[in-house]
Every structure is written in C-alpha cells, then in structure tokens.
C-alpha cells in the first residue's frame, strides 16, 4: 500500500471508531478477533457517546465522502432491515450533505463557460446552494437568453482523488473476501466493485448525465407517469450541467403528498410500472432512484406524475438479460419453481450439474410464503437473506451486470412501502411482464424483426449476385484445400507407417547384434553386420518422418 492509501485507511478506521460504530459488530465467536483488535486501539475512543447510533452512522458516512454516502443512500430505503431511528438518519444523506463554498462553485461555473463572468450567461444566480449531494451541488439562476428558471449543477472540487483512493482500498478488501468467507469466491466481489467503480466514475462526468437525462426525457415524453426536466446542452460540460428547475413534493414526504390529495395507491403502482417500463421496454433505466432524486408534481394529484432528477447512474440490459429476467419473474408469479430452477441452470448462474429437483424444492421453500400477501406483511430483506443461503448451497454466482438492477428494485420496493403499504408489487408487475413476453414471440415479433432488418437487406440486395458468386468460388477453393489436406494426411499416414516399420526392424537388428556380440563372440563379423543393418534401417525410418 502507498503512504496515501495507508493514511486513508487509518482515517477510515479512526472515523468508524470515533463514532463508536464498532457497536455494529455482532457478538459472535467468528468476530472475536475483530473485537479484540478493536480493544487494542484504546486511544481511539467513541467521541460521540451523546449521540444515538443512527446519527453516529450518518455522520461517519458523511465524513468519509461520496463512496460511503452512496452506500448509505442505498441502505436508507431498507426500512425492513433497520429500525426507524437508523433509517431516518440515513435518509438525511440524500439531500443534506454539507455544501462547499458557493464562491468556489461560481469560479468553477465561470471556468466552464470560457472565463466569462456568471452574469454574462445567467441572471439571479444564487450563491447559496439549493441542494448539496455527495458528488455535486446545485445553484439556482435564470437563463439570460429567455428568462427561464434553471438549476446549475457543479462537481465538488478535488473529489476524484478521494474516490479513487477509497476504491483502491475497497478493491483490496474485495480480494480478501474469498479468503475470509467460505462462499466469498461465488460472490465475485472484485467484479461487483468494478461495476460500482464504473458507475461512480461515470457520475463524475456531467456530459454523460446530460445525455442520460435527454434520453430518459425522450423515452417518457408523452407519459402520464414520469417527467424528466429539460436539459440545456449548450451550457453543459464535464464539470457543469444546466437544466430546467422543477417544483414538486419529495416522494419521501408522505404527509405532504396526502395533504395535497395525492392518489397514493395509483402513485405507488406507477412507480412499479415506471421501473418495469424502463427496464423491459427501453432497456435504459434510472439506477439511482433513491427518495432524494424523486419528486411528485403538485399538479393533478388525482393523476399523480413522478419527476426524476440526477440521471448520473443509469443501467441497460441486452435482449438475453431481459428475456431471462422476464421469464424468471413470470415463473415466480406463476409459482413455477421448476421453471425458475431450469432457467438458473440454463443461464449458467448455477453449475450445469446442479440437481434441479433439489434446487426447485429449495426455491419453493423460500418463495412460496411471500405470495398472496400485501407488501406491508412481507419482509423482503429476510426473503433475500433466505435466497442467499439457498444460493450458497447450490454455488449460485452473483451476476455483476445485474447489480444496478437489483439496487434499483430495492429502491422501488422501499418507496412503494412508504407510499402505499398495501401495494402488491407482484400483482402490479405481472400483467406488464406477461404482455412484454407475449410481444416477443409470434407473428408480430417476426414482422417487427423483419422491419428492423429490411433496410440492411435492401442495401445489400445489389451486391447479392456477387456475394453468391464469391461464396461459390470460395466453396470450391475450400473443397480443393480440404482434398489437398486429406491427401497430405493420407501420405503422412503412409510415411509414418513405413517409418515405424523401419524403426522397428532397426531396433530388432541392433539388439540382436548386441546380444550376439556379447554371448557369441565366435560368430565373427555377423553381429557387426546386424548392428550396421539396424542403423541403416533406423536412418531410413528417420528419413521417412521428415
């Protein structure tokens, strides 16, 4: 480890211990060395004993920076895994991170706009940030060209070196996981960290986020379910992004939503529909849908519409991934656990020699209790834990390409639980998935595939006669080459047979001559002639092999 990495590791350990987070270490035999190690660091006491555990955890993650804040944001939606006092504190990480100096943000904006003062492009620039997040912060202004209200997002200064240092440490920890845990290799921790690194680094490029927001806005342009604010690409760069300012109710503010007369049941169902539409229709989904990035429009509360911001992290799935996921979901919904087991084997998620009958029974045991119950009565955290234990028995591997999807699904579940506890996630999603699968097979799918390929074949049609002629000529040449190779192989086979024959004769003659020379010296020159003949036969056999 470099000196910088050692200092960062020391800072992380000191931060956790100074906030008394060793309290989270379970009191088990396997953790005894870790707890003894903590006692040895007696000069790092808990300096915040007056604060509750939830607040201490939030402050520690906030102090450690964006990599840890993002982790806390994900955990904030898992209210079935944490008591309310911890989940409520983690939720504050979403939009209450300490801001950096607004004057420094103004300097960054001016540098991004070619050195001109902010007043040359914007009116009413607010030096005090509207919001501050782990990666960037937002200031309000008006476009000088048309007077529209906008928000200006700027990246935190000097954030990249800190992120890279933390990621290097996480990589080191990931490489130790297979050595420390019996099933650590199956978790593929290094690949998971690599995927996380990619998404985190991508989030630092606001040009990428601008493109993502434009794409999502296009996908839901006429949708009653989701609105994405307009981006002004002429003002965007890697370190700055300008987009329409929106007004809405934070999706986590249930009291305000109810006061506004929002149809909570429809809102919760639309959250599920938006997720599955992004994944299966568009193959392009917002992968950072924690409550701090989702609002609800004040208008038409009886027909509520989501507003999505912060599109820095998005995910996409190929056709194979989508089809596999959809068939798996439908099999779950239909309680066809045999199909689920077979799909896992066919996809390679579990080894091909897996006992399908045993796997089916294990899945049935874990999944059957979750059906026919409202969402509020189901502990999906415990279901995931049971599935993990089942996977361990059958050597199921974590699929890094689906980590973002899994995280987003957790966000959707958490938001759904807060908005409408009676929401049946499975019942809401099942019709959508059945319709999507039906659309992928049959005559309509064939017609659609033909339409997609038609321009290619129209372009290639004039070249078809020449392509056919070239194929026939190459086929004839290939056949000639095959015949030539076959003749050479046959010739080599004959030569090798002859070679083995002469080598065998030579060995026999040499051995015979040697035997006679030792046991029958009275035979005179005969042993010498036999040995000479053997050497000649050996030479002929050797020549045959060349």
From Swiss-Prot:
Localization, UniProt: Cell inner membrane
GO molecular function: ATP binding; protein kinase activity
Parts of the chain that traverse the membrane: 501-521, 522-542
GO BP of this protein: regulation of ubiquinone biosynthetic process; ubiquinone biosynthetic process
Enzyme Commission numbers on file: 2.7.-.-
Membrane topology: Multi-pass membrane protein
Keyword annotations from UniProtKB, A to Z: ATP-binding, Cell inner membrane, Cell membrane, Kinase, Membrane, Nucleotide-binding, Transferase, Transmembrane, Transmembrane helix, Ubiquinone biosynthesis
Protein name: Probable protein kinase UbiB
Lineage: Bacteria, Pseudomonadati, Pseudomonadota, Gammaproteobacteria, Enterobacterales
């Amino acid at each position: 480890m470099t000196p910088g990495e050692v200092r960062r590791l020391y800072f992380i350990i000191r931060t956790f211990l100074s906030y008394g987070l060793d309290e989270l270490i379970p009191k088990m035999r396997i953790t005894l060395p870790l707890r003894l190690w903590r006692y040895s660091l007696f000069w790092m006491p808990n300096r915040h004993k007056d604060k509750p555990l939830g607040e201490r955890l939030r402050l520690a993650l906030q102090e450690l920076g964006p990599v840890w804040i993002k982790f806390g944001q994900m955990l904030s939606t898992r209210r079935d895994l944490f008591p309310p006092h911890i989940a409520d504190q983690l939720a504050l990480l979403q939009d209450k991170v300490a801001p950096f100096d607004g004057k420094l943000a103004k300097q960054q904006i001016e540098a991004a706009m070619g050195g001109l003062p902010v007043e040359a492009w914007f009116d009413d620039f607010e030096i005090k940030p509207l919001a501050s997040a782990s990666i960037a912060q937002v200031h309000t202004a008006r476009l000088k060209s048309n007077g529209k209200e906008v928000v200006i997002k700027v990246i935190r200064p000097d954030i990249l070196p800190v992120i890279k240092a933390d990621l290097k440490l996480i990589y080191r920890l990931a490489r130790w996981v297979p050595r420390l845990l019996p099933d650590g290799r199956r978790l593929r921790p290094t690949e998971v960290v690599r995927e996380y690194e990619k998404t985190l680094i991508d989030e630092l490029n606001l040009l990428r986020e601008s493109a993502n927001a434009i794409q999502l806005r296009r996908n839901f342009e006429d949708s009653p379910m989701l609105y994405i604010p307009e981006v002004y690409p002429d003002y965007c760069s890697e370190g700055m992004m300008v987009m329409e300012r929106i007004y809405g109710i934070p999706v986590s503010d249930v009291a305000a939503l109810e006061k506004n007369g929002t149809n909570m049941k429809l809102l919760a169902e639309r959250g599920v529909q938006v997720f599955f539409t992004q994944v299966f229709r568009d193959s392009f989904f917002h992968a950072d849908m924690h409550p701090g990035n989702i609002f609800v429009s004040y208008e038409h509360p009886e027909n509520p519409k989501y507003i999505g911001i912060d599109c820095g992290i998005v995910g996409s799935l190929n056709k194979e991934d989508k089809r596999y996921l959809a068939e798996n979901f439908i099999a779950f919904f239909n309680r066809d656990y045999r199909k689920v087991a077979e799909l896992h084997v066919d996809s390679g998620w579990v080894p091909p020699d897996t006992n399908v009958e045993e796997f089916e029974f294990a899945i049935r045991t874990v999944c059957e209790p979750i059906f026919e119950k409202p969402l509020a009565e189901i502990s999906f955290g415990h279901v995931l834990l049971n599935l993990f234990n089942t996977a361990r028995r059958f050597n199921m591997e974590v699929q890094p390409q689906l980590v973002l999807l899994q995280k987003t699904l957790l966000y959707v579940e958490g938001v759904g639980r807060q908005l409408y506890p009676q929401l049946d996630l499975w019942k809401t999603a099942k019709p959508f998935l059945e319709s999507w699968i039906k659309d992928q097979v049959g005559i309509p799918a064939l017609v659609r595939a033909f339409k997609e390929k038609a321009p290619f074949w129209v372009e290639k049609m004039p070249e078809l006669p020449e392509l056919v002629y070239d194929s026939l000529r190459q086929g004839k040449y290939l056949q000639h080459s095959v015949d030539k190779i076959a003749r050479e192989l046959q010739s080599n086979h004959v030569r090798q047979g002859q070679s083995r024959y002469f080598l065998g004769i030579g060995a026999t003659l040499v051995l015979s001559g040697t035997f006679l020379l030792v046991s029958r010296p009275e035979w005179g020159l005969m042993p010498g002639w036999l040995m000479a003949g053997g050497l000649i036969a050996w030479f002929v056999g050797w020549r045959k092999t060349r």
